Each structure stands twice: as structure tokens, then as C-alpha cells.
Amino acid sequence: MERKPLELESTDNHQNPSSAVYGGSVTAVDSVEEDVQNQKKVVYRGWKVMPFIIGNETFEKLGIIGTLSNLLVYLTAVFNLKSITAATIINAFSGTINFGTFVAAFLCDTYFGRYKTLSVAVIACFLGSFVILLTAAVPQLHPAACGTAADSICNGPSGGQIAFLLMGLGFLVVGAGGIRPCNLAFGADQFNPKSESGKRGIDSFFNWYFFTFTFAQILSLTLVVYVQSNVSWTIGLTIPAVLMFLACLIFFAGDKLYVKIKASGSPLAGIAQVIAVAIKKRGLKPAKQPWLNLYNYYPPKYANSKLKYTDQFRFLDKAAILTPEDKLQPDGKPADPWKLCTMQQVEEVKCIVRVLPIWFASSIYYLTITQQMTYPVFQALQSDRRLGSGGFVIPAATYVVFLMTGMTVFIVVYDRVLVPTMRRITGLDTGITLLQRIGTGIFFATASLVVAGFVEERRRTFALTKPTLGMAPRKGEISSMSAMWLIPQLSLAGVAEAFAAIGQMEFYYKQFPENMRSFAGSIFYVGGGVSSYLGSFLIATVHRTTQNSSGGNWLAEDLNKGRLDLFYFMIAGILAVNFAYFLVMSRWYRYKGSDDEVTTYETNENIIKQQDKNVA
């Protein structure tokens, strides 16, 4: 039968077969018409509400990053923790935040919706920043400062002090875990996804989102870190707490203007249904011409785009095979979703399953970023950080700003130079595909670690063979190598982020079903969480394996006695293998394609005939 375009109204001469069989109940066409009518009632204010959303995003990122960016130094300088202990805490904390995004996404999409989730999250972030501020401002909440002499007593924190600190970090886990998966999707909710201006607005919002993110990191890693390191920890932590309070005010000021999409129920239940039914029906023969003969149904007000059939993971197709035992409701809906699923449900599950191998490779990629956000700080502490002849010393944590600068600058170069150039070559509107963008980022990440290894080898050689610049507190001799040599590795990591991070976020957003976009945001951060825990595991394993070896501990407290360069080369090797794996998975992957413009008449007709045959 010839496929015909979807119409908003049915006529007497061209009636939906399901309407004839089921007595004129709600059909797919009626559902679309009702959906369009309901959509007109929604007032999309688009850019008019962006001052509230982007303003909240900016101050929220300034607050969180201002609190966390120098936390590594804070734990060693104020809480008197050893470097490896502090690095392990930071990795575990970052991983917990990232895994927390998955829980928040589930609660958001299932029960509360994005607005309510964000409301709780921004308040939790403020409380977390305030508690961390108190650990610095109240002397009883942190241990006494260590003496400057090498043999001076240096007491660690008490159990109560650690507990209070962890309470503040716990609030930040709740806050950041709720904000990260929901903020981007909530901003995109304010644009009409069906209009051309709305689609352009969503694309532009992605750029603004990452611009504010990098802007906040740059400002936090320069101004806020400088105040914390050179003026006062109390004042330096007051700034992000105040900014988080402003973020709360700005967010709630736009309360009556936002488009607030209600939670649509657990999408995880639909995934479980497809898997369970496919297992139950595993003995059935695969359907012939499955794009025609698999059962399909679109409920009223269905938000997701209608997906074309794909022939990957065909064992899942059996969940949508209609048998004589399967019962349908009068409107065509399965009577028991745990016995019969729709082809649409199956294709949505396929979308998620296809993403997982790509997500795994992207998670390994983040090993680069987690290491480039921690150990370069320790490298800078034992390098020459003087700027010019005026005696100004750049705070060690500030050097990470070059990662953000590299990312920010290259985003502009990518958008204004590379995309137009590649568009002429490939004919694609985006210049290159999303997977090509992610793969390029993984390549640059590997290169940044190789460069980091050579730079650390040079820094260590200078420290061991040339006059040094004194002793770093609780570390070792300060190498005469300028800390500016850290810029190449950090800039390459920034370029990697411009390719891979933005590419991943857009990839997940577009490849996940529409009712799982909070999950799409969370899976991006869960990947970062996996890499954080993997980074902690690698640090602990390398430390334990090498501390008693003849070559010495690679990750010694004094970097001059360690071999951080070999650690960098080891991770570069892991990423090289991961890059090869990603290339294989990219060739296998199939992008999600919608079939919204195709009528369901032919499919419905085949389904009815199939059921009648089964009943007979």
C-alpha cells in the first residue's frame, strides 16, 4: 500500500482502519490534532525568560565553581590533608555529584518535573556553599594551621570537623546533582520545538549555556581563587555563597513566566516492559516486514517523535509482535503493557541501547579532564609561578583557567571558521557529525596527556639538576621551570572539551527520546562520575603498586621524588585504546530518525489484519 502523508482530519473517503474496527475511538490522527490544539495553549516566551534562566545559570555556576575550584588547595592548606587524600576526596565527591544526576533525573522526569527539581536544587546549593563558608570562618570548624618548619606539628581535622565539612559537600551533591541534568533541558523547554525560530533558539541556547559555564569557571579560577589564596579563605568563600543566593533570587523571579512541563511518569518502566516482554516472547519467530507488521500505537498527547523502524537489536522486536493472547483496549492501547509493547516503545529502547557503547567511550575520555583538573595544580605548586618582575605569584589553582580559555576560544573558532569550512566540504549543516566531533575531542584529549607527560618530565629534571626556588609547603623543592609550560597541555584539554563535551551533550539530547531529556543530561554527568571513580581507583592502585618499588612511588607527595610523567603516559595509553574502540563503535552506530510525517494507516491496517488472523 502506498504511504500517504499524515493528515490532521480524517474524511469519509479515507478513514483510519482502527476507527472502523474500534467504533470510532481516538485514533492516531485525532491524537495529533488534539496535541496541536493543546500546544497552542502553551505560551513559549523563548528569549524573554532567558535573563532569568541564564542569569541563574551564571550565578549558580559562579557559586558552585567558586566553592569547588580551589577545594583541593583548601583541603590541604586549611584541613591539613595529604595531597593524595585530598585528590581522592575530590574525585569521589565529583563522582558522587555526577552519579547523583541520574537519581535527580529519575525524580524529575517521573514525579516532580524540571521546575520543582531545580527549585530544591538551587536552595541546596546555597546551603552547601554557606556550610563550606562556615568551615573557614569559624575556627572551631577546621584544624589549627600547621607551622612553617619541616618538623612542626601538623594536626589533621577532628571527626566533627570532617562531618561538618561533609555535610556541606552533601548539600552541594544534592544541589549540583539536581541542577546539572535539568537546567539545560529546562532552558530548552522555553522554546517552541515545532517552529523554526524555536529550533534556532534551542541551538543558540546550547552555545549560551556553555559560554556561561566557561565564563563562570574562568572568573572563579582567577578572581575568586586569588581572593581565597592571597586575601582570605573566609572572604573567598563568602563570594560564591552570596552568588548562590543571587542565583536563587533570579531563578524564582521568573516563576510566573516559565513553561513548566509536568512529569510524564517513569520512562524506565517502558524500558523494563520492552525487555520483559521480549524475554517472554523470545520463542516467537521474527516478524516479516517488521516495519509494517509490528504492533504500534500512539497515545493521545504523545510527546515523543515517531521513530522509523531499525533492524538492530531485532530480539527486542518480539515485544511488539501481536499474538492471539494479547488484548487491546477499545482505543487500540494494549490492555496489559507487560504482555505487549508498541514498535515505538521498542525503537525508543533501541535508541538508548545504541547510545551506551558511545557513552562508555566518552566516560573513559573524561579521565583526561579529571586528571588535568587536579595534578596540574600540584605541578604548579612546585613550579615557578612568578609573573614578571613585580613579584606577583599566580595561585596554583588558577592555571586550570587555561583549560577553560582554550575551550572558550576554540568554541568561537569552531563555530565561525571550522563549521563553515567543513560544511562546504561535507555538505552537512553542522560541518561534521556529532560522533566525528566527539572522536576529535578524544584524540585531542590523548594528545594533551602525552604533552603533560613531557612537561612534567622537564619540570622534574629542572628541579633535580638546576637551582631551585625554595620549598613548597609540605611538598618539596620548587622547580625553576616556569609554570607557563603547563599551558599547552591545559589548552589541548580545553580544545578536547570544545569538541567532545559539547558534542556529547548535544548528542545525548538529540538521540534520547524526548521524555527522557533529563536522563540525557544526567548520562553526560554520570560518564564524568564513572571517570572520577576510575581516576580514584587508578590513583590508589598506582600509589599502592609503586610505593615500595625500586623506581619509587610515581605519585609521591613531593612530585620531584615521584614519576607523575609516567602516570600521564599510562593514562594516555588507556585513552589511545579507547579512541580505537570509539572509532569501531562510531561506524556501527545509527542516528535516531523520526517518522512523524508518515501515516500510521498502513501499519494499523496490517496490525488489524494480523490480529484478526490470529483470533481466527
Curated annotation (Swiss-Prot):
Subcellular location as annotated: Cell membrane
UniProt entry keywords in alphabetical sequence: Cell membrane, Membrane, Transmembrane, Transmembrane helix, Transport
Repeat is among the record's keywords: no
KO phenotype (gene knockout): 48% reduction in total glucosinolate levels in seeds. Gtr1 and gtr2 double mutant has no detectable glucosinolate in seeds.
Region (Disordered): 1-22
GO CC, any one term: plasma membrane
InterPro entries, alphabetized: MFS_trans_sf, POT_fam
Transmembrane residue ranges: 59-79, 87-107, 118-138, 159-179, 205-225, 233-253, 349-369, 392-412, 435-455, 483-503, 519-539, 566-586
A Pfam family the protein falls into: PTR2
The keyword RNA-binding belongs to this UniProt entry's keyword annotation: no
Tissues and organs where the protein is expressed, per its UniProt entry: Expressed in roots. Detected in shoots, stems and flowers. Expressed in veins and in the root vasculature with highest expression in lateral branching points.
GO biological-process terms attached to the record: glucosinolate transport; phloem glucosinolate loading
Record's bilayer topology term: Multi-pass membrane protein
Molecular function GO labels: glucosinolate:proton symporter activity
Protein's job: High-affinity, proton-dependent glucosinolate-specific transporter. Involved in apoplasmic phloem-loading of glucosinolates and in bidirectional long-distance transport of aliphatic but not indole glucosinolates. May be involved in removal of glucosinolates from the xylem in roots.
Protein family (similarity comment): Belongs to the major facilitator superfamily. Proton-dependent oligopeptide transporter (POT/PTR) (TC 2.A.17) family.
UniProt name for this protein: Protein NRT1/ PTR FAMILY 2.11
Organism this protein belongs to: Arabidopsis thaliana
Species classification: Eukaryota, Viridiplantae, Streptophyta, Embryophyta, Tracheophyta
